[in-house]
Amino acid sequence: YRHIDTAAAYGNEKGVGEAIRHSGLDRSQIFIETKIWINDYGNEETLHGFEKSARKLGLEQIDLLILHQPLPSAFDRTVDAYKSLEKLLADGRVRAIGVSNFIPHHLDEFLQQVEVVPAVNQIEVHPYFQQAELQRRHEQHGILTQAWSPIGGITFYRGGEKSTLDDPTILGLARKYDKSPA
């Protein structure tokens, strides 16, 4: 399957859209996920953020649209932004909606104020940072945990090791199952 995870903040939506158009693949063969950045949180702002992303991607419908992160200093704007995602979902402009980087207390407050439970919460998860409590919370609410940096990220080094991929336990499991460490 082909899943492209992009975001307004990455500055690459236009390039992703061009790649999709030049790929020759049927749109149904590509799953596109993008994220609304915090400067587009609010009601109309979020709808405008969606329009900007859809235009850059060259798409009428986005498969998964999520909020890039909570805005704790103005959490009401985070909720308003998500309510705009709910509207886009109801209108068929997006197929699924979710959040990213929400921790348990964000989820608790958030779920009391929205109608649609997020399909996903994209969080940092890897062998050295499993966020078990948050993953249990996801399971309780039917939220899929989607990992970013699932192999340890580009800056996470534990105990002087170079990379999660060099971890002796990971290497041992890879050898045992005849797989690459990745």
Q: What does each model-identified segment do?
A:
Residues 1-30, 80, 84, 154:
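N-terminal binding-site loop/beta-alpha segment at the start of enzyme catalytic domains
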Residues 70-182:
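Beta/alpha (TIM)-barrel catalytic core signal, keyed to glycine-rich beta->alpha loops juxtaposed to Asp/Glu
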Residues 4, 62, 97:
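Glycine-centered flexible beta-alpha turn that most often forms the glycine-rich phosphate-binding loop
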Residues 27-41, 61-70:
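A short, structured active-site edge motif that brings together acidic residues
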Residues 46-67, 87-91, 112:
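CE4/NodB-like, metal-dependent polysaccharide N-deacetylase domain
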Residues 29, 59-62, 94, 118:
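Local beta-strand N-terminus motif with an aromatic residue
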Residues 13-20, 47-54, 82-86, 107-108, ...:
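Generic structural signal for well-ordered alpha-helices
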